[in-house]
Amino acid sequence: MTMRFMTIVKTRENAEQPSPALIQAITKLGEEAAKQGAMVEFGGLLPTAAGARARLANGKITVTDGPFSEAKEVIGGFAVYDVASKQEAIAWTRKFLEAHIGLWKQELEVEVRQMMDAPAQGC
């Protein structure tokens, strides 16, 4: 039985864009994970200036266009893995971080979170 994990890549709002060499290294790793049946999906996100934030507070919904200057860190990318254990998801995350060594000078953090199973149909 496998479990799905989402890895959430956190970086600074003003982080540099990845170099072509880094994109190539990440793509190669994603292809390797896909060949092994571990990778479901992965991708990078545009800066928050291209996005919006929706919030529910006190029964009211507000939407704010980016950028979000108050954010110290933002989500820069994600990956979804279908693996046998949290340890395997962490191993793929380590490989992802290792791919950045020498190609990314800024701090990077990746959160590994197990995804909930979808509810059964007809419930």
Question: What spans do the regions from the language model cover?
Answer:
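Conserved, structured core segments of small domains
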Residues: 1-123
